[in-house]
A protein has these predicted regions:
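Membrane-embedded alpha-helical bundles of multi-pass transporters/translocases
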Residues: 2-322
């Protein structure tokens, strides 16, 4: 009984070991390094390195986001209906990681194409990037709630991968341009925006991505789902559930708005510093803001034990406006 009190663990719940928690969290480093390089610098690469028309890039990004809105729930259904001896998440995490790593590198390498061929190539690669990222990302975050069924423990566990994700975002956003420039210098390129630096940086991140996910896959247990009965939910049924749940719709609306604002800020910030401030390297200072996000993640588990989630959310929304 004394041991149960000291650990605050309940026998009816399952818990992941400390090793599993951190090995799972490490997996977020590579995936979010990829996500942040694309989110922060892909548009700059398209317009200032490949010299694609900004209007075309904007339309491409919009079409890709619309397709993602369809693609994401489909992948969720696929994961939910997967039954293998490796579980339902691990197999897709491996497949998605390998596919996305290859497409990610190809996204930052044009093979010296030009004209219509380049526009077609970029369009195909970017759509494929979004699809392969979804194949990896959906099972990764879906795996998280299965590490423990204790609601309070889930709050603590969820902080770990998000902290590592923020660390990856901080590293790429703050040092990305410097690394690309340095890689171009090593390759003998004189232009900061030369494609070589982007390609080499993408290869480095892809390797980190594969290693990080490998640490997750080989160190985090997932129970076999062979023979496990679970009621199947079709995509049509899922959409009906969403439409009938007004609270869920409100939450989805908040997430969409938040992600829209975040993506706009990340994509256009480097242009602001380059065109308005006259120095794109000031974007690195902007990247230091992620430290505040990391501090918030560290504080959240303790804060959530003192005040309700509703108040935590309200305060978090108010802080950026203060």
């Amino acid at each position: 009984m004394s041991n149960q009190k000291s650990t605050n663990k309940h026998p009816q719940y399952k818990y992941a070991s400390t090793r599993e928690k951190y090995c799972f969290g490490i997996g977020a480093i590579g995936k979010d390094a990829i996500c942040n390089l694309v989110g922060s610098f892909l548009m700059l690469y398209f317009t200032d390195t490949l010299y694609l028309a900004p209007a075309f890039v904007g339309v491409l990004f919009l079409v890709a986001r619309i397709w993602d809105a369809i693609n994401d729930p489909v992948m969720g259904m696929i994961c939910d209906n997967t039954h293998t001896k490796f579980g339902k998440f691990r197999i897709w995490l491996v497949i998605g990681t390998l596919l996305n790593s290859v497409v990610f590198v190809l996204l930052f390498h044009s093979f010296h194409l030009s004209g219509t061929s380049l526009y077609i190539y970029v369009s195909v690669m970017y759509i494929l990037y979004g699809m392969t990222y979804t194949i990896m990302d959906v099972p990764y975050w879906s795996w998280l709630p299965n590490l423990t069924n204790d609601p309070h423990e889930r709050e603590k566990v969820s902080v770990i991968p998000r902290f590592f994700a923020s660390l990856a975002g901080f590293s790429v956003a703050t040092f990305g341009l410097y690394i690309i420039n340095h890689l171009n210098k090593i390759a003998g390129e004189k232009n900061l925006y030369a494609e070589t630096g982007y390609t080499l940086f993408a290869i480095i991140i892809a390797v980190i991505f594969i290693v990080a996910i490998g640490i997750t896959v080989f160190n985090v247990k997932e129970e076999s789902t062979i023979g496990v009965y679970a009621e199947k939910t079709s995509l049509k049924q899922a959409f009906r559930i969403i439409i009938k749940n007004d609270q869920l719709l409100a939450f989805i609306g908040i997430l969409l708005t938040f992600n829209l604002c975040t993506q706009i800020a990340k994509s256009f910030a480097v242009y602001y510093f380059k065109c308005v401030c006259g120095n794109e390297y000031l974007y690195s200072i902007f990247g230091f803001a992620i430290i505040a996000e990391m501090a918030g993640l560290v504080c959240y588990p303790k804060i959530s034990t003192k005040i309700s989630r509703e108040k935590v959310y309200a305060y978090a929304c108010a802080l950026p406006l203060a």
